[in-house]
Curated annotation (Swiss-Prot):
S-S bonds: 113-130, 122-135, 311-314, 311-538, 341-395, 360-372, 402-415, 530-537
Chain positions covered by the region annotation Immunosuppression: 513-529
Name the UniProt record assigns to this protein: Envelope glycoprotein
Keyword Membrane tagged: yes
Keywords: Cleavage on pair of basic residues, Coiled coil, Disulfide bond, Fusion of virus membrane with host cell membrane, Fusion of virus membrane with host membrane, Glycoprotein, Host cell membrane, Host membrane, Host-virus interaction, Lipoprotein, Membrane, Palmitate, Signal, Transmembrane, Transmembrane helix, Viral attachment to host cell, Viral envelope protein, Viral penetration into host cytoplasm, Virion, Virus entry into host cell
UniProt gene name: env
Site (Cleavage): 444-445, 624-625
Cellular component terms per the entry's GO annotation: host cell plasma membrane; membrane; viral envelope; virion membrane
Name of one Pfam family that matches: TLV_coat
Motif (YXXL motif): 630-633
Native source organism of the sequence: Xenotropic MuLV-related virus (isolate VP62) (XMRV)
């Protein structure tokens, strides 16, 4: 059993390496930022670069999530190598400078060794991390090098038949059969393995590539693979909290000025050029709230004018500020991420109240299946599901306009198609007036009607479906568009507020840790700040990262123990773990079943013994009955008879 980490008082555990520990904790805290939604779409760029020349062999950009942006990368070996392998005599040796050298290079095998994880004895960059046989993990060679843990696989691509000595079609050799642009005739295909799709690509990964020759040394080149996420915003600097600075009061209503007749400019005056209009200011909190209430009124007035003759619309001041109504709708399927999926949204907002029944996608748990009228399973493949106009996907990871099927197939995430409505309650005038009247008798608590109950489901089947009866579709009106614009503006502000608060907290922790590190350096002679103060050392742990990682490791260990426990059980013990009703059924019928089995096994033997015993007793009784009907004759001795005569 392991000893506890703090078996002695903390003041006796002062570490002379405290500043270095603080530096490590600072780096760890800076990296533990809350992760985005798995359905967030980014602009991802993969680059293959020759580390010896700095030349880029391939740069592929695509839109997608961080889970499915692992495309096949196509490039030419000579674009990667350049002139590093050229021999002094181009007509004899291989290389990439001459057409003949490119053709001879195509005949050689090659092998690749990883530099991001170097095994013992594999050497360094000079050997291409291939210091001995067995270090190679991929390539195109007769011994078929492979690995189950490396991140990529690199093979030769399809070379067209009849492609001659690799002439360059752009320098006057276009009429020669087999000529290609740039003389490229050594195509390579790089694919990501399952381990590569799970790995972290925060830093470049390095590999060494060597050309296999039967004689002489194998030429070496080094290349790196880098992933760049272009639209991830930078971290905010230390300063005022933008969440507080944007809390502006409601704007004052603008006074309408009557138009005046323009006067001609005086003679000799220079013509005045109107300046550029001032930049539009982002609406403050007060304006956003008023826009929500105004949009709710316009939408309600369009659908039910009788309810808006005299009413009170109250915006709920406490969370949840929004509620969703599950609806049925037809989403659009895209092979690539559409434009509305690539917005820079962090998807950190969730819905705590969803009502109704609608369309569900993914592995919906039993606790949320009441929200599903129809549950669809995603098929294999990488594509995106965009929500219809006026709706959004409410997922267990947050709100998102698009879904990635790759994320749904790899995780336990689930989503429901919902309409978003602000938490605005509708009250009649009698209820509001009654709150200010002093009454001794109180009526029953009135039922609060929210905007979701009054207008829920309109975009997917309410007013929008009433066009045939003469009703205007709400989704196509300015009132609904104004309400949707107010909702989107408020949601965007909420997301920015959450991100700003998170980054402000992280920045504050970095400042505190930096001050602590500086104090430790100042009191280095005394053994650090804790030793100078003669107090226990306190260390900072970012719960958003450390706890999440710890729980993930704990969950992984529990799964491993569960699998180990199940593998150690016999088939009979495993039957009882499959379902609870099976255990109850077995325990109920086990007793009668055992009794019946014993009767079938020993019943015939016992029955035969009993029958034989009865037969013996009956035979004895019969013998006694027969002896009672006869008398026994006396025996006479012949000698005695003769003596009597």
């Amino acid at each position: 059993m392991e000893s506890p980490a703090f078996s002695k008082p903390l003041k006796d555990k002062i570490n002379p390496w405290g500043p270095l520990i603080i530096m490590g904790i600072l780096v760890r805290a800076g990296a533990s930022v809350q992760r985005d939604s798995p359905h967030q779409v980014f602009n991802v760029t993969w680059k293959i670069t020759n580390l010896m020349t700095g030349q880029t062999a391939n740069a592929t950009s695509l839109l997608g999530t961080m889970t499915d942006t692992f495309p096949k990368l196509y490039f030419d070996l000579c674009d990667l190598v350049g002139d590093n392998w050229d021999d002094p005599e181009p007509d004899i040796g291989d290389g990439c400078r001459s057409p003949g050298g490119r053709k001879r290079t195509r005949l050689y095998d090659f092998y690749v060794c990883p530099g991001h994880t170097v095994l013992t004895g594999c050497g360094g960059p000079r050997e291409g991390y291939c210091g001995k046989w067995g270090c190679e993990t991929t390539g195109q060679a007769y011994w078929k090098p492979s690995s189950s843990w490396d991140l990529i696989s690199l093979k030769r691509g399809n070379t067209p038949k009849g492609q001659g000595p690799c002439f360059d079609s752009s320098v006057g050799s276009g009429s020669i059969q087999g000529a290609t642009p740039g003389g490229r005739c050594n195509p390579l295909v790089l694919e990501f393995t399952d381990a590569g799709k799970r790995a972290s690509w925060d830093a470049p990964k390095t590999w060494g590539l060597r050309l296999y020759r039967s004689t002489g040394a194998d030429p070496v080149t080094l290349f790196s693979l880098t992933r760049q996420v272009l639209n991830v915003g930078p971290r905010v600097p230390i300063g005022p909290n933008p969440v507080i600075t944007e809390q502006l009061p409601p704007s004052q209503p603008v006074q309408i000025m009557l138009p005046r007749t323009p006067r001609p400019p005086p003679s000799g005056a220079a013509s005045m050029v109107p300046g550029a209009p001032p930049p539009s200011q982002q609406p403050g909190t007060g304006d956003r709230l008023l826009n929500l209430v105004e949009g709710a009124y316009l939408a309600l007035n369009l659908t039910s004018p009788d309810k808006t003759q005299e009413c009170w619309l109250c915006l709920v001041s406490g969370p949840p500020y929004y509620e969703g109504v599950a609806v049925l709708g037809t989403y659009s399927n895209h092979t690539s991420a559409p434009a509305n999926c690539s917005v820079t949204s962090q998807h950190k907002l969730t819905l705590s109240e969803v009502t109704g029944q609608g369309l569900c996608i993914g592995a919906v748990p039993k606790t949320h299946q009441a929200l599903c009228n129809t549950t669809q399973k995603t098929s294999d493949g990488s594509y995106y599901l965009a929500s219809p106009a006026g709706t959004i996907w409410a997922c267990s990871t947050g709100l998102t306009p698009c879904l990635s099927t790759t994320v749904l197939n790899l995780t336990t995430d689930y989503c429901v198609l919902v309409e978003l409505w602000p938490k605005v309650t509708y009250h009649s005038p009698n209820y509001v007036y009654g709150q200010f009247e002093k009454k001794t008798k109180y009526k029953r608590e009135p039922v609060s009607l929210t905007l979701a109950l009054l207008l829920g489901g309109l975009t997917m089947g309410g007013i929008a479906a009433g066009v045939g009866t003469g009703t205007t579709a709400l989704v196509a009106t300015k009132q609904f568009e104004q309400l949707q614009a107010a909702i989107h503006t408020d949601l965007g502000a909420l997301e920015k507020s959450v991100s700003a608060l998170e980054k402000s907290l992280t920045s504050l922790s970095e400042v505190v840790l930096q001050n602590r590190r500086g104090l430790d350096l100042l009191f280095l002679k005394e053994g650090g700040l804790c030793a100078a103060l003669k107090e226990e050392c306190c260390f900072y742990a970012d719960h958003t990262g450390v706890v999440r990682d710890s729980m993930a490791k704990l969950r992984e260990r529990l799964n491993q123990r569960q699998k180990l426990f199940e593998s150690g059980q016999g088939w009979f013990e495993g039957l009882f773990n499959r379902s609870p009703w099976f255990t109850t059924l077995i325990s109920t019928i086990m007793g009668p079943l055992i009794v019946l089995l014993l009767i079938l096994l020993f019943g015939p033997c016992i029955l035969n013994r009993l029958v034989q015993f009865v037969k013996d007793r009956i035979s004895v009784v019969q013998a006694l009955v027969l002896t009672q009907q006869y008398h026994q004759l006396k025996s006479i001795d012949p000698e005695e008879v003769e003596s009597r005569e």
